[in-house]
Amino acid sequence: MITVATAECFTHANIGLTIHKAAAGYEDFEFKYLFSEEDLKLMKNVRVISAMFVPSIIGVEKLLDIKLPEPDFNYKYAKAYSEEKDLEVAKLMAEGLKKKLNVNISIGSTAGVGRGAICILTDNNRYLFTSDVYANLITFENIKERQKNGIEKGIKRFLEILKKEYF
């Protein structure tokens, strides 16, 4: 059984929830179109331990026992970084989650100003990438488009990695 956990910000736990729904055999769910029949069969070997939406620095630091860098931008109570720091923070989140829950695959996501970042950490490798959509959390420019693209890209990459490393 392959165990998975996510700590997500800009993707609002949708990567983890979608993986859970596919693994649990839900008949219909929002991003089902990303899964082939073969993918859905493989997902029977996956268990989601946790899928979290964690927008705040204090939430990430306390839940994952990690220290995050200072935000690049002031934004209400949530964290807002530049794309460069988003890449660092997504990696820190995935590492903290993997250490805390001892899962096979951990996923972290965060986005402030830029394309955001997603990190998928497996037992053997780290995959760090951005969405394809530039957005600005401070002005709300393109944030819904970036979110959808990040969810889709995160799920697609998860499936590629799952097949490459575990099946």
UniProtKB/Swiss-Prot annotation:
Membrane-spanning residues: none
InterPro entries registered for this protein in UniProt: HcgF
Domain of life: Archaea
A Pfam family assignment: HcgF
Matching HAMAP family: UPF0254
Family per similarity comment: Belongs to the UPF0254 family.
The protein's name in its UniProt record: UPF0254 protein MJ1251
